[in-house]
């Protein structure tokens, strides 16, 4: 009887221990890290309309129209720590919902603040963008302040069509250009998800998945719109 009781208690202990471990794993999978040295606190999304002028001897205006979405991610230190940001990697970009018109490109900053993307041509949609920790934010050099800062990138929707006109008018790059092409909001809406990996100076990495719907709904009417996203309850960071 005593031997049976010992075996029963032993196996009961094993079962309880396994249940506790399983509960911890499930809870971590659902909630992620409770205490992060750095976290994503805000995303600023700016949706606008751009155009590239084509030389055309027959028309005053011949403009290739592009809808662009600038993304600025704010990374803040969340606790008293001596850790700093070593690097932040944006990877595994996935188009969850493709637009009906246009082709998506992902661009990195290559210029100063006044012309961040003027010379940006390489498409990073099937690649990754890595910001190194530095003294200050420098998007052109892909550097983010190592105590927290802002990083940026752009999703552009190219090949929407050409605006051709012989009116001697000033061109305003806003939603009217999309209207003139007969482009509707529903035709250019798309959704992209990607992983953000924050690596600290202690070589500890935390990964979360972010999803962004673009462009902002008011782009057709307002032409240039911005939106702040601060609810990240669905972005779960885990150690990797």
Q: Where are each of the predicted segments found?
A:
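Short, structured surface segments that line ligand/substrate-binding pockets
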Residues: 190-198
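Hydrophobic alpha-helical membrane-insertion segments, chiefly the h-region
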Residues: 16-27
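Non-catalytic macromolecular-recognition regions in eukaryotic signaling proteins
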Residues: 25-187, 201-240
């Amino acid at each position: 009887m005593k031997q049976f009781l010992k075996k029963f208690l032993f196996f009961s202990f094993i079962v309880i221990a396994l249940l506790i471990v399983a509960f911890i794993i499930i809870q971590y999978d659902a909630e992620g890290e409770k205490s992060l040295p750095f976290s994503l606190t805000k995303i600023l999304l700016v949706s606008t309309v751009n155009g590239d002028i084509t030389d055309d001897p027959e028309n005053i205006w011949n403009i290739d129209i592009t809808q662009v979405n600038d993304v600025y991610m704010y990374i803040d230190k969340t606790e008293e720590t001596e850790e700093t940001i070593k690097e932040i990697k944006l990877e595994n970009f996935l188009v969850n919902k493709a637009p009906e018109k246009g082709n998506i490109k992902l661009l990195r900053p290559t210029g100063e603040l006044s012309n961040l993307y003027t010379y940006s041509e390489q498409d990073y949609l099937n690649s990754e963008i890595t910001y190194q920790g530095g003294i200050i934010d420098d998007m052109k050099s892909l550097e983010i302040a190592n105590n927290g800062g802002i990083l940026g990138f752009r999703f552009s929707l190219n090949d929407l069509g050409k605006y051709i006109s012989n009116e001697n008018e000033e061109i305003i790059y806003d939603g009217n250009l999309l209207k003139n092409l007969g482009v509707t909001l529903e035709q250019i809406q798309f959704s992209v998800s990607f992983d953000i990996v924050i690596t600290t100076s202690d070589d500890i990495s935390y990964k979360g998945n972010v999803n962004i719907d673009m462009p902002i709904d008011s782009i057709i009417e307002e032409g240039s719109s911005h939106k702040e996203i601060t609810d990240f309850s669905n972005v779960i960071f885990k150690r990797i």
